[in-house]
Amino acid sequence: MDFEDDYTHSACRNTYQSFNGMDRDYGPGSYGGMDRDYGHGSYGGQRSMDSYLNQSYGMDNHSGGGGGSRFGPYESYDSRSSLGGRDLYRSGYGFNEPEQSRFGGSYGGRFESSYRNSLDSFGGRNQGGSSWEAPYSRSKLRPGFMEDRGRENYSSYSSFSSPHMKPAPVGSRGRGTPAYPESTFGSRNYDAFGGPSTGRGRGRGHMSDFGSIHRPGIVVDYQNKPTNVTVAAARGIKRKMIQPFNKPGGTFIKKPKLAKPVEKMSLSKSPTKTDPKNEEEEKRRIEARREKQRRRREKNSEKYGDGYRMAFTCSFCKFRTFEEKDIELHLESASHQETLDHIQKQTKFDKVVMEFLHECMVNKFKKTSIRKQQTNNQTEAVKIIEKDVMEGVTADDHMMKVETVHCSACSVYIPALHSSVQQHLKSPDHIKGKQAYKEQIKRESVLTATSILNNPIVKARYERFIKGENPFEIQDHSQDQQIEGDEEEEEKIDEPVEEEEEEEEEEEEVGEVEEAEEVGEGGGVEGVGDTEEGGDVEGEGEVGAVGEGEGEGEGVGEVEEEEAKEEPVGFSVDQAEEN
């Protein structure tokens, strides 16, 4: 029979003859006679004929749905060898040409199938059954693919009578080396209509489902295959659902982990009074903080003597001087008010609070002035300290005392010469450092203000200040002496404490700030610390002034230090509670 006969007139007759046992070979899969072995015996009979007629002439189920015509024509594994050079019974998805078989003829057959567009709607190349890498296709399972009861069209199980007749999978791993055992997931290669797998094809483009192509031939309906397919689908669904289910679970696990430390913290705060372990930890923390403050005082004393405690300071502006006039001018200056405004803006403090903070600085200045008056009479001690300063210096060392100017912004000492100071003022380093130091002062002033207000002693005084009383008035001499020492040391330590907080974050910056504060006063020497708004501290005077301060410190300074040692306890406790 000629292959060029009309399709609709010859297909049924040819197939009918083949079913009657005639040993004929008609191209499309060589369904020619009953001598073909399909693995499960021969297939034929009236039912197959009816299925064929429904498929060939009715064409009522060409979308790949369920029913008796769900499966495409069946071909044996080696049927390709019996095909002719040109087969009109094969669709446009041609596998009968060697070059297409070798390079994976996906689309691109010489004849276009009328059902190509409808088949493409079922999904991508991987879903339609390409020979692309197996894991990629399995990982891209689609919900629509799993929910369709006509999914047998997509499964290679539905296209073969036995697993041994399935084509060898080909993917990125090479021929015959599937990524997963095909017995587990089922090969999703749909090069099922003749010969081994067709290779890589054209990449990851769309590819239609060959199982749904309607061609003349025997339609084999495997009734038992959907169960296996659904098992594979169930596996895929389960694997798919586990991943998104675990993600919320993972976050759930994290939440209790985050909540547990919070509970511990809350428990550790409440039973602090009763639990001895927590009390011991709190005591250790307080002792460690006190020890740190004590070491800082000792270091400053070694560097500059106790005179650094005789300086007038503004904790907010990091201003330090040994002259009363300078501190008075500073407390009334625009730079000091600007710092207070910045604190109020950042902390949203009330105006009354800002007035109280300013009064704290004024009171601190007054107490320092009183302390200096009490120590002015100790001149002999000053001479002794002065000797110690120049101890070991001989003429061969070519050393002498000179006046210097200390720049806190740059942390350098400049000779007290007009030319040297002017040169430094115009230097790029100073211009840059001046702005950076000003911003640093603003940042630290906020921390200082909050740390002062968190002190329980200051809180009590603030309550009195709100009531209109004088919070700094001496009520009980013994108590007030301790309170005054506490507050003074607290406000002096406000800077170190604040630096302690920043030490945990920026240790280097803290060191510079601390040194700038303390060295500034040492370099301030006997007396003039005119601080310009630019951040320049002109500490004019002789180094002997440091000795003078040190001598004074030996007398009352020791008493004040004893008082100061008690103060950090209250402050540290409060700070520890804060942390």
UniProtKB/Swiss-Prot annotation:
Q: Which domain of life is it from?
A: Eukaryota
Instruction: Give all N6-acetyllysine modified positions.
Output: K247
The Acidic residues compositionally biased stretches are: 483-520, 529-541, 549-565
Q: Which GO terms describe its biological process?
A: mRNA processing; regulation of DNA-templated transcription elongation; regulation of RNA splicing; RNA splicing
Matching entries from Pfam families are given as:
AKAP95 (PF04988)
* Record note on quaternary structure: Component of the DBIRD complex. Interacts with CCAR2; the interaction is direct.
Name of the gene encoding the protein in the UniProt record: ZNF326
Task: Write out the biased-composition intervals (Basic and acidic residues).
Answer: 272-290
Mind telling me which GO cellular component terms the entry cites? DBIRD complex; nuclear matrix; nucleus
What positions does the cross-link Glycyl lysine isopeptide (Lys-Gly) (interchain with G-Cter in SUMO2) connect? K140, K240, K247, K254, K264, K401, K459, K467
The entry's function note states: Core component of the DBIRD complex, a multiprotein complex that acts at the interface between core mRNP particles and RNA polymerase II (RNAPII) and integrates transcript elongation with the regulation of alternative splicing: the DBIRD complex affects local transcript elongation rates and alternative splicing of a large set of exons embedded in (A + T)-rich DNA regions. May play a role in neuronal differentiation and is able to bind DNA and activate expression in vitro.
Q: Which residues carry this modification: Omega-N-methylarginine?
A: R173, R235
Q: Where is this region: Disordered?
A: 154-194, 248-302, 470-579
Q: Give the source species.
A: Bos taurus
Q: Which UniProt keywords apply?
A: Acetylation, Activator, DNA-binding, Isopeptide bond, Metal-binding, Methylation, mRNA processing, mRNA splicing, Nucleus, Phosphoprotein, Repeat, Transcription, Transcription regulation, Ubl conjugation, Zinc, Zinc-finger
Its annotated compartments are: Nucleus matrix
Residues bearing the modification Phosphothreonine: T251
- Give residues where Phosphoserine occurs: S48, S56, S63, S69, S81, S82, S91, S106, S114, S118, S121, S137, S212, S270
| GO terms of molecular function | DNA binding; RNA polymerase II complex binding; zinc ion binding
What is this protein called in UniProt? DBIRD complex subunit ZNF326
Kindly indicate whether the keyword Nucleus belongs to this entry: yes
PROSITE patterns named in the record: ZF_C2H2_AKAP95
InterPro entries assigned to the protein according to its UniProt record, in alphabetical order: AKAP95, ZF_C2H2_AKAP95
